[in-house]
């Protein structure tokens, strides 16, 4: 079997991430949350405290081959909240919250989630992605529930502050999309409920993509789950597992699961690989149509093992890190369709 070097690097990258998410971390906080050790708050007037922003060049501006960055002409904004990159994989990553001046962590954030996830939305709107004092991955695994929550609260405070700064200084009445993954989705849920839902601002919400984290069907009172591809003022959510594993383990029927190939939430809704317009793995510039399928199953999205050169080595059963990327072009085109539908409805 001849596996290209770039593909092998990607497979190794996936295997390493799988190891990290399974609990084999080398560095953790190891003590209770201490507010005296919390890094300095961000200043969102500074462009370097944004991972992506229309006023600077960043990885969210890039596109796979054949696509165009349309931020300059878009009538919509996208507020993107990135997932946990602060994984405790190297010395110094032992605070409950990440520092904003950690240049290596920022570079990792930009070359991973900002490039591979935030860029999805540059066909629909201007992208604003704040840097924030993200909680250490241990905040999702530690037995110290008080410290876990305080770390997450610190991270969320930054996200809300960033959103409010964006609204005051750059939004200017424009409709917006909120998109988030994993830890970002945790904060997106709270942000939507605290700042958007049942408030005048909700009228400006094109859609929310709350991906990689559970959204209970009764979490929002006046913000519905999207049930059609062009519905607006609603949210989508999914968590992706390997199909055979998911059929045995998935059991959260009270969680919303959107099929990103059909944009419905019907239990058992299946879409074949032929409906997948293109996933994006490494190298970034290559779209991979038909990389996998999608089926809604008891609160989760089930997918066949993705097919790409070297995929025989990929044995992960939880496809969390690829929730967005397996359906890259479908999500991109859906965000564009919802934005167009929003303006059509307003006119």
Question: Can you say where each PLM-predicted feature lies in the sequence?
Answer:
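Positively charged n-region of N-terminal signal peptides that target proteins for export
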Residues: 1-11
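Sec-dependent N-terminal signal peptides
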Residues: 11-19
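C-terminal motif of bacterial Sec signal peptides marking the signal peptidase cleavage site
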Residues: 21-23
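Surface cap/lid and interfacial helix-loop subdomains adjacent to catalytic sites
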Residues: 25-26, 157-172, 194-341, 345-346
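Active-site catalytic motif of lipid deacylating hydrolases and related acyltransferases
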Residues: 28-39, 82-174, 308-347
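Loop/turn elements at helix/coil->beta-strand transitions in domains of secreted/extracellular proteins
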Residues: 74-76, 123-127, 172-175, 203-207
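Gly/Ala-rich beta-loop-alpha elbow adjacent to hydrolase catalytic centers
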Residues: 180, 184
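Hydrolases whose catalytic domains are alpha/beta-hydrolase-1, hotdog thioesterase
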Residues: 187-191
């Amino acid at each position: 079997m001849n596996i290209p070097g770039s593909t092998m690097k990607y497979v190794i990258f996936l295997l390493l991430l799988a190891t990290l998410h399974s609990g084999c971390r080398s560095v953790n906080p190891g003590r209770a949350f201490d507010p005296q050790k919390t890094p300095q708050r961000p200043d969102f007037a500074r462009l370097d405290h944004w991972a992506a922003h229309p006023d600077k060049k960043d990885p969210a501006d890039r596109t796979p081959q054949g696509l165009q960055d349309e931020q300059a002409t878009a009538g919509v904004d996208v507020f993107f909240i990135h997932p946990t990159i602060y994984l405790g994989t190297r010395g110094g990553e032992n605070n409950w919250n990440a520092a904003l001046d950690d240049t290596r962590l920022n570079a990792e954030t930009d070359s991973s989630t900002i490039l591979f996830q935030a860029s999805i939305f540059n066909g629909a709107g201007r992208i604003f992605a704040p840097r924030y004092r993200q909680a250490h991955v241990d905040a999702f695994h530690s037995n110290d529930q008080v410290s876990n929550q305080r770390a997450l609260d610190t991270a969320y405070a930054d996200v809300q502050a960033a959103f409010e700064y964006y609204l005051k200084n750059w939004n200017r009445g424009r409709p917006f999309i909120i998109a988030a993954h994993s830890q970002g989705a945790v904060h997106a849920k709270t942000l939507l409920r605290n700042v958007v839902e049942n408030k005048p601002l909700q009228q400006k919400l094109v859609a929310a993509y709350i991906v990689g984290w559970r959204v209970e069907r009764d979490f929002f009172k006046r913000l519905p789950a999207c049930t059609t591809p062009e519905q607006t003022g609603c949210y989508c959510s999914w968590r992706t597992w390997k199909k055979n594993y998911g059929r045995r383990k998935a059991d959260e029927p009270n969680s919303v699961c959107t099929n990103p190939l059909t944009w419905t939430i019907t239990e058992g809704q299946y879409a074949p690989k032929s409906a997948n317009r293109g996933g994006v793995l490494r190298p970034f510039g290559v779209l991979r149509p038909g990389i996998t399928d999608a089926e809604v199953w008891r609160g989760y999205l089930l997918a066949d093992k993705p097919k790409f050169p070297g995929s025989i080595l990929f044995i992960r059963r939880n496809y969390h890190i690829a929730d967005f990327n397996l359906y890259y072009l479908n999500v991109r085109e859906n965000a564009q369709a919802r934005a167009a539908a929003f303006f059509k409805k307003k006119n």
